[in-house]
Amino acid sequence: MARILTRIKEAEENNQKKEEQVKAELAQYEQLKNNELIDLNKEFQERLTKLMKEKEKNEEEVTEDEQHKLELILEQFRQKVLEIEKTYLEKEEEEIAKKKNLTNEIIERMKQNNGCH
């Protein structure tokens, strides 16, 4: 009977050790799982941050490209305005010259008609 009690006690101790071992292994597994989740989360955050920076960079590049295009359009507009102003001034000068010539011709005719030389 003492043998049976000893075996029962040994079995209980053995079961308790196995239970503690299983609990320790389970805790270790949970810790590994948590560490893996933390690592995955960290990796995800790093990737997300990288993608956001790339997006901002791309938006800045697009903005710079659009800005450059707008500057080119503005420069073309300025050139066109200068061309128009130049053409206008040339025509205005031609009109002034024509009026001067006409005035001079009228004066000459009046001189001739009045007998002034």
Curated annotation (Swiss-Prot):
Residues 1-20 are annotated as: Disordered. Residues 7-20 have a biased composition (Basic and acidic residues). The keyword Repeat does not apply. GO terms for biological process: sodium ion transport. Keywords: Ion transport, Sodium, Sodium transport, Transport. Involved in ATP-driven sodium extrusion. Belongs to the V-ATPase G subunit family. This is V-type sodium ATPase subunit F. It comes from Enterococcus hirae (strain ATCC 9790 / DSM 20160 / JCM 8729 / LMG 6399 / NBRC 3181 / NCIMB 6459 / NCDO 1258 / NCTC 12367 / WDCM 00089 / R). The lineage of its organism: Bacteria, Bacillati, Bacillota, Bacilli, Lactobacillales. The gene is ntpF.
